């Protein structure tokens, strides 16, 4: 077996350490205001993509909520039976809340979908 020179091993460890401690920039998801602005200025085809994104975000949250309900845990929100929203309905739900509460516009859109669902379908015990 070939031995790795100590200098190369030291260089690899140093490079890895630099990568771990160097500041990195992560791209967070759009906030509601930005997402709606991008949606509104998009072409017809791009709007359909955004509607899929918003609808799939809601769908994922709905599946997570279904698991909580099925396992008898506290649900995130309490929708009616056979609940389903389309992408355009999610867009309008976000738009309504953003226009009534300007602070809501600064919330990441994925989290905002959950908050809007909780507001629209609160759990009352």
List each language-model region with its residue ranges.
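Short, compact, well-ordered microdomains
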Residues: 92-125
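N-terminal secretory signal peptides that target proteins for export/translocation
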Residues: 1-6
